[in-house]
Amino acid sequence: MSNITISSHPVVNEQIAILRDRSLKPSQVRSVVDEISRFLAYESTKTLKSPSVSIVPVLRSGMSMMSAFSKVLPDVPIYHIGIFREKSTLQPIEYYNKLPKKSTDTAVILDPVMATGGTANAVITTLQEWGCKNIIFVSVLASEQALTRFSNIPGVEFVIGAVDKSLDAKGYLVPGVGDIGDRLYGATA
């Protein structure tokens, strides 16, 4: 899995342990995700060479990583793709796409949790069809299953905060962090 980098930074590990606490308030969840994202932003951009780069947060939870990435890449365009996972089939449904006609050479995708990999696959496919040649997918937490699915894909790199070994019947990571979008924004299912 040469295209996958998993953070070994102790601060990232500590913050992910805090994020697993389901009693955190939404403001605390956002703060922890932002802190982890700062480290992942530096890690994911340290070898960036292309002058043509965009940031693509996956709506809505990917927005929680934007502050950190826009500080590291302050003048790159930010495009949005909205995808949700249908609850019964776990299939990704795209509901919003604000990519311009001309692609950037490199896109940095932000999505804090990669569970089944369905959303990741949908976004990667969309960006490849758009013409993007290099993709860096950044996630706070991912499943082993999803990372295995994406190992050694040419032109796609993954930078991950930590890896959980399994998924539950609803497609959530175990032990995971719950529905990160709901936790970030105080929504209830």
UniProtKB/Swiss-Prot annotation:
UniProt-annotated location(s): Cytoplasm; Nucleus
InterPro entries according to UniProt: PRibTrfase_dom (IPR000836), PRTase-like (IPR029057), UPRTase/APRTase (IPR050054)
Keyword Glycosyltransferase: yes
MF terms in GO: GTP binding; uracil phosphoribosyltransferase activity
UniProt pathway annotation: Pyrimidine metabolism; UMP biosynthesis via salvage pathway; UMP from uracil: step 1/1
Positions that bind D-ribose 5-phosphate: Y172
SUPFAM superfamilies per UniProt: PRTase-like
Domain of life: Eukaryota
Cellular component GO terms, alphabetical: cytosol; nucleus
Residues binding 5-phospho-alpha-D-ribose 1-diphosphate: R60, R85, D111, P112, V113, M114, A115, T116, G117, G118, T119, D179
Pfam families: UPRTase
Swiss-Prot/TrEMBL keywords: Allosteric enzyme, Cytoplasm, Glycosyltransferase, GTP-binding, Nucleotide-binding, Nucleus, Transferase
Paired cysteines (S-S): none
Known catalytic reactions: UMP + diphosphate = 5-phospho-alpha-D-ribose 1-diphosphate + uracil
Record comment: activity regulation: Allosterically activated by GTP.
Binding positions (uracil): L173, G178, D179, I180
Cofactor: Mg(2+)
One GO biological process term: pyrimidine nucleobase metabolic process
Free-text remark on how the cofactor is bound: Binds 1 Mg(2+) ion per subunit. The magnesium is bound as Mg-PRPP.
EC number: 2.4.2.9
Family under the similarity heading: Belongs to the UPRTase family.
Role according to the record: Catalyzes the conversion of uracil and 5-phospho-alpha-D-ribose 1-diphosphate (PRPP) to UMP and diphosphate.
Protein name per its UniProtKB record: Putative uracil phosphoribosyltransferase urg2
Organism from which the protein derives: Schizosaccharomyces pombe (strain 972 / ATCC 24843) (Fission yeast)
